[in-house]
Regions:
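Short, conserved catalytic/metal-binding motifs centered on acidic residues
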Residues: 31, 46, 70, 114-119, ...
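Short capping segments at the starts of secondary-structure elements
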Residues: 38-42
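Short acidic loop-to-helix transition motifs that present clustered carboxylates
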Residues: 158, 183-185
């Protein structure tokens, strides 16, 4: 059986102290992802999703949570997370969803096509604090229809070094990258 997203979330370090952990971290992260896929955009909506669907989630994921964590617990857990560790968990999970052609013998003749593109998040700027809008870079595998990786671009940088870092992280062997024309520079 292939590893699940829950098993990858189990590897994310828990930001909470040892005592008083009523809820394991991995299920809370998984339930948060499911809540967001269902349209939740706030901590309260994530809490409401978990509370409403807790019995079904326990059955589907073979868990035994007696009650949903409070809104404040969800908020505390999510705000304390290490974003880089969570990103690694998502990347490792995405790698299991692929076709596996990178390691196959035909990787040189049939490369994995990966599109890399950056997007500015609408409404993410903060004029009061003089913060520019958030800009994200994503790598998308065409055949598998999944995002392999994404990263935030620093305010004082641009897409060019971010694309180079992303390509290095993903590895060049067996891949055909498509990028915007501005990346065709020395």
């Amino acid at each position: 059986m292939s590893p699940t997203l829950l098993s990858f979330f189990a590897e994310v370090p828990d930001p909470r102290r040892g005592q008083g952990k009523m809820y394991p971290l991995a299920p809370i992260l998984l339930f948060t992802v499911l809540a967001m896929l269902s349209g939740a955009v706030s901590y309260r909506q994530v809490h409401a999703f978990i509370k409403t669907h807790l019995d079904r989630l326990n059955v589907v994921f073979d868990l035994s949570l007696r009650r949903a964590p409070a809104y404040s617990s969800v908020r505390f857990i999510l705000r304390g997370l290490d974003g880089a560790a969570l990103e690694v968990a998502f990347r490792r999970h995405a790698a299991t969803l692929g076709t596996g052609r990178i390691d196959a013998d035909d990787a040189a003749t049939k490369p994995v096509c990966v599109a890399i593109d950056g997007k500015t998040l609408r409404g993410s700027f903060d004029a009061f604090n003089d913060r520019k809008a958030a800009h994200l870079m994503s790598a998308f595998a065409h055949d598998d229809q999944i995002i392999l990786a994404h990263l935030a671009i620093d305010e004082k940088s641009n897409e060019i070094p971010a694309v180079q870092d992303l390509m290095t992280t993903l590895g060049l062997s067996g891949k055909l990258f498509t990028v915007d024309a501005m990346h065709a520079c020395k």
